[in-house]
A protein has these predicted regions:
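Flexible internal linker/loop segments at domain or repeat junctions
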Residues: 66, 70-112
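C-terminal regions of proteins
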Residues: 148, 152, 157-180
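A short, acidic, amphipathic alpha-helical segment used as a generic capping/interface helix at domain edges
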Residues: 108-125, 143-146
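Single conserved hydrophobic/aromatic residue that forms the stacking wall/gate
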Residues: 178-188
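A charged, amphipathic alpha-helical module
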Residues: 1-68, 72-80
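Glycine/threonine-rich flexible loop motifs
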Residues: 137-143
Length: 188
């Protein structure tokens, strides 16, 4: 949770790498000292941006026995792929190519997002996928049909979509009803 929020909403972007390095150093020190999590289902969280009270989805996963190993969303790893070609003859075309190839749910067809999710599942040895759909994000809600099909039929993993918002009003239902029932957390 601290890692998710630790690098966002900073006005001094120059300090962000230092903050992230501190977190990495702390984690690596604890790892070398033998501090490890017990085996838990490894969960990929995908969908809408996470921050503020929407972190309840991550808390619910981890409070119910899972561990979030990757986040693929509008403000996460999705935006890091396909860097802008700096030596391109037309920099505007290079910028357009970068943003048009981002696997965002408003793009169609959106094979890039499916490919990225597949890569994350393989690289992080994911046991299940939780898609967070914010109320009003109709593009992510509509695309969740394709994500569910890919995850369950091609990757043969459990998938659940959690409809929520940035409030705390549904924290109980998100935690107990949705995620406790998710077969990844209850059966693995």
């Amino acid at each position: 949770q601290k890692m998710v929020q630790g690098s966002k909403y900073r006005f001094d972007f120059a300090t962000t790498p230092g903050v992230v390095k501190e977190v990495i150093d702390k984690i690596m020190t604890e790892y070398r000292q033998g501090k490890h999590l017990e085996k838990r289902p490894r969960i990929l969280v995908t969908g809408c941006p996470i921050g503020g009270d929407s972190l309840k989805v991550i808390r619910a996963i981890e409070d119910n026995g899972g561990v979030v190993v990757a986040i693929e969303n509008c403000s996460g790893v999705r935006t890091l792929g396909n860097p802008v070609e700096e030596d391109c003859e037309d920099i505007y075309e290079a910028i357009a190519r970068k943003y048009l190839s981002t696997g965002c749910s408003i793009m169609t067809p959106n094979d890039n997002r499916i490919d990225l999710i597949g890569e994350i599942i393989d690289e992080y040895h994911v046991d299940g996928v939780v898609e967070m759909i914010l109320t009003g994000c109709h593009a992510t809600g509509a695309e969740s049909v394709y994500i569910r099909k890919f995850v369950t039929e091609e990757k043969h993993l459990p998938y659940i979509a959690v409809d929520t918002d940035y409030s705390t009003a549904d924290q109980g239902p998100v935690s107990y009803t949705h995620l406790r029932a998710h077969e990844t957390l209850s059966d693995l």
